[in-house]
Amino acid sequence: MHYLTPDLCDAYPDLIQVVEPMFSNFGGRDSFGGQIVTLKCFEDNSRVREQVELDGKGKVLVVDGGGSLRCALLGDMLADKAAKNGWEGMLIYGCIRDVDVIAQTDLGVQALASHPKKTEKRGIGELNVPVTFGGVTFRPGEYLYADNNGVIISPSTLTMPE
């Protein structure tokens, strides 16, 4: 499904919250949306790997990486796995790498920046807990919509106006 966040903002002004404009679009999908699954991890993408191996149909993985700009929480192999397992997209409060390959992957990906270094693997991270960044709190089960205009969240599913 193709989403236009300005149209959703106009149609649902009382339902949406707009995430502060700090993310860049890196994925092969310019527009994505779905039910939020949250993950809080700092400079360790072990739990990201676990999540992308699961069925992600209709879901968006929101990763709170603490805003770290010191390593990448997502690379081409995990992005490919997420796409193959049906994930709609990922919003990463941190960095990614392998950006040229990810740009060709059928997955929405927004992140702060790119960084060539991989993370440590310590198996640390909290799944499906509320995470706060960009001026909003992302809650598991709520909905996220993203495109080149920005990122919005809503407590319920939104449909594009006609």
UniProtKB/Swiss-Prot annotation:
Task: Tell me its EC number(s), please.
Answer: 4.1.3.17, 4.1.1.112
Q: Does the keyword Cytoplasm apply?
A: no
Family in the record: Belongs to the class II aldolase/RraA-like family.
Residue positions annotated to bind substrate are 75-78, 97
Provide the cofactor note recorded for this chain's UniProt entry. Answer: Divalent metal cation.
Q: Tell me yes or no: is Membrane among this UniProt entry's keywords.
A: no
Known partners and oligomeric status:
Homotrimer.
* GO molecular function ontology, one term from the record: metal ion binding
Under the heading Pfam families, the entry gives: RraA-like
Keywords for the protein's UniProt record, in alphabetical order: Lyase, Metal-binding
Write down the species: Pseudomonas syringae pv. syringae (strain B728a)
Q: What this chain does, per the record?
A: Catalyzes the aldol cleavage of 4-hydroxy-4-methyl-2-oxoglutarate (HMG) into 2 molecules of pyruvate. Also contains a secondary oxaloacetate (OAA) decarboxylase activity due to the common pyruvate enolate transition state formed following C-C bond cleavage in the retro-aldol and decarboxylation reactions.
Which cofactors is this protein said to need?
A: a divalent metal cation
For the protein in the UniProt heading, the enzyme class is lyase
Q: Fetch the NCBIfam families from UniProt.
A: NOT-MenG (TIGR01935), PRK09372.1 (NF006875), PRK12487.1 (NF009134)
Q: Tell me which InterPro entries the record gives.
A: RraA, RraA/RraA-like, RraA/RraA-like_sf
Q: What is this protein called?
A: Putative 4-hydroxy-4-methyl-2-oxoglutarate aldolase
Q: Which reaction does it catalyse?
A: 4-hydroxy-4-methyl-2-oxoglutarate = 2 pyruvate; oxaloacetate + H(+) = pyruvate + CO2
Q: Where does a divalent metal cation bind?
A: 98
